[in-house]
Amino acid sequence: MFGSKTLFSWAAKRSKDFYRKKSKIDNFRSRAAYKLIELNSKYRFINKEDVVIDVGFAPGSWSQVAKKLVGNKGKVIGIDIQHIAPPEGVLPIYGDIRDPNTLTKLFEALRLLHEPNTNDSIDCRVVDAVISDMLHKATGIRIRDHALSMELCASALHVALTFLKSNGSFICKFYMGDEDADLQNLLKSHFRFVQVMKPKASLKESREAYFVCLERKP
């Protein structure tokens, strides 16, 4: 007979294999695509013709999903420190999001999207959704992994607060721990709706979850 731990491990492995195999069939770059699909199916933060920034877009599955959701008239900009080929239709910006030069590149990209034939300045808050599936490679030390994820969330939030329009949305992956409540309170000061969700495509034993932040306050 199988013990409870063995059954749990078997079920988790089966779930992981299901989404990995499905991602290959659906031509997504990773199984993470289904996390965004589920999140957006429930909260509808990405719509046709939207402008979306994908922070830390490698390997590109979230950008793939976002581009399908916004359609031909929408725009998806992916930012990453890794120089990987972007999914079709996604504009890549390579650099560290903590580097002001990277944000300058992002601002210029947004300006060209909206006013390609002028050098006039524009309001940089023109983005409908900022999404982030970033997470440091796990160290195995929970406190350390949590602290690192909080740093990444803070960096992604800075991008969101710089470029999101009023009523825009921010989605961010994090590693659960003691600082969750502090970050959630900070998010509530900037967004009218903040909720934590763990998609079905996430492994049950994983401590990852997502902050879903909707309706940015003016």
From Swiss-Prot:
Keyword Protease: no
Active site: residue positions: K173
One Pfam family cited in the UniProt record for this chain: FtsJ
Keyword annotations: Methyltransferase, Mitochondrion, rRNA processing, S-adenosyl-L-methionine, Transferase, Transit peptide
GO molecular function, one term: rRNA (uridine-2'-O-)-methyltransferase activity
Catalyzed reactions per annotation: a uridine in 21S rRNA + S-adenosyl-L-methionine = a 2'-O-methyluridine in 21S rRNA + S-adenosyl-L-homocysteine + H(+)
Keyword Methyltransferase: yes
EC number: 2.1.1.-
GO biological process assignments: mitochondrial large ribosomal subunit assembly; RNA methylation
Subcellular localization(s) per the UniProt record: Mitochondrion
Main location: mitochondrion
Residues where S-adenosyl-L-methionine binds: P59, G60, S61, W62, D80, D96, I97, D133
Record InterPro entries: RNA_methyltr_RlmE, RNA_MeTrfase_FtsJ_dom, rRNA-MeTfrase_E, SAM-dependent_MTases_sf
Top-level taxon in the UniProt lineage: Eukaryota
Protein's job: S-adenosyl-L-methionine-dependent 2'-O-ribose methyltransferase that catalyzes the formation of the 2'-O-methyluridine corresponding to position 2791 in S.cerevisiae 21S mitochondrial large subunit ribosomal RNA (mtLSU rRNA), a universally conserved modification in the peptidyl transferase domain of the mtLSU rRNA.
Membership in a protein family: Belongs to the class I-like SAM-binding methyltransferase superfamily. RNA methyltransferase RlmE family.
Record's protein name: rRNA methyltransferase 2, mitochondrial
